[in-house]
């Protein structure tokens, strides 16, 4: 679901951040749920705007999610509330951000999200609800 372009951009940003951060304390706190919500809304609105300008979905997702990824990588050391203080790897973080961005974008511009993506997101959501009920 997530483009290779995003992963390449995110990897470059993470590398640049680590180079710039040398000599600084390595201990960074996980993003709070409130911060994650803010980053999610910003990335979703950006995705929606890119779609309205005619950018294809995968590129729009990359555009929207890059800032989110950068904030979590740079400010929070790849740590999110659900990671229990441990840094996520690049793939896990980018996949989670893609999912969160897409789900939030469904609230703002559902008409600009491909039907196939909507169907996959709904199926994943239904599966999580089903698993949570057991």
For every predicted segment, state its role:
Residues 16-18:
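N-terminal signal peptide c-region/cleavage motif recognized by signal peptidases
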Residues 4-14:
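Sec-dependent N-terminal signal peptides
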């Amino acid at each position: 679901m997530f483009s290779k372009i995003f992963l390449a951009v995110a990897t470059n940003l993470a590398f640049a951040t680590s180079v710039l951060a040398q000599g600084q304390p390595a201990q960074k706190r996980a993003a709070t749920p409130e911060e994650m919500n803010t980053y999610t809304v910003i990335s979703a609105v950006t995705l929606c705007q890119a779609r309205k300008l005619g950018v294809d979905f995968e590129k729009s997702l990359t555009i929207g999610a890059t800032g989110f990824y950068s904030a979590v990588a740079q400010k929070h050391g790849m740590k999110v509330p659900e990671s229990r203080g441990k840094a996520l790897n690049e793939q896990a973080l980018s996949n989670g951000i893609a999912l969160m961005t897409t789900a939030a974008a469904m609230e703002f511009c559902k008409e600009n999200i491909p039907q196939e993506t909507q169907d996959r997101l709904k199926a994943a959501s239904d599966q999580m609800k089903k698993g949570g009920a057991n």
